[in-house]
Amino acid sequence: MKKINILVTTVGGVTSPDILKAYRNTPGYEIKIVGTDAFEFAVGKMFVDHFEILPISKGNEKLFIKEIKRLVKKYSIDLIIPCGNDDNLVISRYKDLIPCKIMTGNYKDLLIAYDKGKVYEELEF
């Protein structure tokens, strides 16, 4: 069985419990999950092996990334899955500074994807 350590951000979101259970039950893998959120009472806290409170990503990007890097080292993280839009943007913007795999798109593409007007412009024929 392959072991993998995953860091999931914004585990206080509505879909977090289902997503975390799905990761945990992935056949062929022994998965340890580190969950983060800016709030102590995040619902996903109950579904992770370790829980850490992080600063809000959009509030102080550099501090947020510094804390992400600390957790990657502390828990030997193999993969980061950012679950909040703001976390996704910040992590994608600084992904070259983070020493593990990250499940996120290109920063410039995400900026377009999160703006309905820009998506419409990009898709116009």
Enumerate the language-model features and the residues they cover.
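A conserved helix-loop-beta module that forms one wall/lid of the active-site cleft
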Residues: 97-125
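ATP-binding N-terminal substructure of ATP-dependent carboxylate-amine bond-forming enzymes
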Residues: 1-106
